[in-house]
């Protein structure tokens, strides 16, 4: 008959591996609020999130000491921060400005943001996005629908492999790649004109 050994009796390297296997990809909501600080006479940013603390960090001290998560998105002396594993977690920022994420810019691997493809995005916001050159995956929640993002798909220097860029229609939930959006656009306006034949050809 098999005998269950108390977890604490397993060798440390086995216990560490078990804690590592508890890692699951989470979508971590990241937003900021401003607060007036009377002591300094300044307005300070504080991170806010609806994402709960990772369950493993609430289990025991040994789990917390494994370094599976790190404190992130802390602004200056603010006591507020989030626990994140940047290798697996997806950072969801909604309409939050990319500038606020500058301290974590080189750590973030996966991001979701919500925008309209307007002039502000095309000529300003996209420049901030392009600085996040360690990204491996981007999801864009399209407030104005998928078709409106065809121009951005062509113009933006996406800082991750283009096959890892996904667009999501906010209203319908439909998902599409940039190439899918190209096809949708062609179905409406027709294919791009072919190159004209050189002079003298028949």
Map each language-model feature to its residues.
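Structural motif
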Residues: 9, 100-103, 127-130
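Structured loop/turn residues at beta-strand edges in well-structured enzyme cores
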Residues: 86, 106, 133
């Amino acid at each position: 008959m098999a005998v269950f050994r108390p977890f604490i009796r397993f060798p440390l390297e086995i216990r560490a591996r078990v804690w590592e296997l508890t890692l699951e990809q989470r979508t971590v909501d990241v937003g900021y609020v401003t607060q007036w600080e009377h002591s300094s006479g300044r307005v300070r940013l504080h991170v806010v999130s609806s994402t709960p603390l990772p369950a493993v960090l609430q289990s025991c001290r040994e789990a917390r000491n494994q370094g599976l998560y790190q404190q992130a998105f802390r602004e200056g002396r603010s006591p507020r921060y989030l626990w994140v594993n940047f290798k697996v977690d997806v950072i969801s920022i909604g309409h939050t400005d990319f500038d606020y994420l500058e301290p974590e810019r080189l750590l973030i691997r996966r991001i979701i943001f919500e925008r309209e493809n307007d002039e502000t995005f095309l000529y300003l916001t996209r420049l901030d996005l392009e600085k996040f050159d360690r990204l491996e995956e981007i999801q864009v929640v399209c407030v104005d629908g998928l078709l409106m993002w065809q121009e951005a798909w062509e113009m933006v220097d996406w800082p991750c492999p283009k096959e890892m860029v996904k667009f999501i229609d906010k209203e319908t939930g439909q998902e599409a790649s940039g190439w899918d959006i190209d096809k949708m656009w062609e179905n409406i306006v027709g294919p791009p004109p072919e190159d004209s034949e050189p002079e003298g050809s028949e």
